Amino acid sequence: MILVWKPLALEDRVQIMEFIGADNPLAAIELDLAFESKADALPAHPTMYKPGRVKGTREIVVHPNYVMVYAITGKTINILRVLHAARQWP
């Protein structure tokens, strides 16, 4: 399977890194590595995580405060968003 980070998800990652990195650069890097690690594992087990709140999506709790939303389309896994758990989605 092919893994694709959609533009909004990449933008989310940058904003999260900037926000956390302002106070704790090391924590920001560790969290971003966790996003990358979870995403990289998806092609092996794409349906491992729970169905999302939006039909056709799945959600990974990467950290108690952050959820990664993805969708599977054919042979492609699209990372759609990386959101704070308290954020309203959709």
Stretches found by the model and what they are:
Residues T57-H63:
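A beta-hairpin/wing motif
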Residues P46-T47, R58, R81, R87:
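Flexible, active-site-adjacent loop/turn segments at secondary-structure boundaries
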Residues M1-I2, P90:
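Absolute protein N-terminus
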Residues E36, P64-V67:
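Σ70-family region 2.3-2.4 aromatic/basic alpha-helix that recognizes the −10 promoter
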Residues Y66-V67, A71-P90:
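Enriched for short, Lys/Arg-rich terminal
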Residues I2-T57, T73-T76:
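Basic, Lys/Arg-enriched alpha-helical interface segments
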